[in-house]
Design a protein with these regions (language model features):
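Sec-dependent N-terminal signal peptides
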Residues: 4-12
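Acidic/His-enriched low-complexity segments
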Residues: 14-150
Length: 150
């Protein structure tokens, strides 16, 4: 009976891990550096931001760039000093680089956005239980949740 119970628990554990597993997607670029410039609106719990990503393609012909961008409204995207076409799906920002680039190129995209993060960035402000609490925001996004605010 103990063997059956242990086996069932092991199988249940394996099944629960598989449901939450999201494999690392293949990437088309190597991001070298990011400059993050944000303003935090504590009262509305929003982030108004501009992020610059400097990157190099990993292939010989890369003409678009997809980045995770959940809980964001993208306002503008530029490659160098030129606005480029983009669209958003529910969880990603898709950018058309206007031509193909290769691993010998180093590019910078600048993205202006507003975010209302559900996770990754947390807001604390006074409430009825803690009326003297100071306004504060802190991050705990690591690699999986930062795309909700940056």
């Amino acid at each position: 009976m103990k063997k059956i119970t242990v086996t069932l628990l092991l199988l249940a554990s394996i099944q629960s891990e598989q449901k939450n597993h999201k494999p690392t997607p293949d990437r088309a670029v190597d991001i070298h550096h990011s400059i993050i410039d944000i303003k935090i609106d504590f009262l509305s719990e929003k982030v108004i931001g501009k992020v610059s990503h400097t990157f190099s393609p990993l292939g010989s012909s890369v003409s678009n760039l997809d980045l995770d961008a959940e809980d964001m409204i993208i306002r503008r995207v530029r490659l160098g000093d030129k606005d480029i076409p983009f669209f958003q799906s529910e969880e990603q920002l898709h950018m058309d680089l206007l031509k193909s680039f290769s691993w010998t190129d180093t590019l910078t995209v600048v993205i202006n956005y507003t975010a209302t993060p559900r996770t990754g960035l947390y807001f604390f402000k006074p409430d009825s239980s803690y009326p003297d609490r100071k306004l504060q925001a802190w991050t705990q996004g690591e690699e999986t949740d930062n795309h909700h605010w940056v």
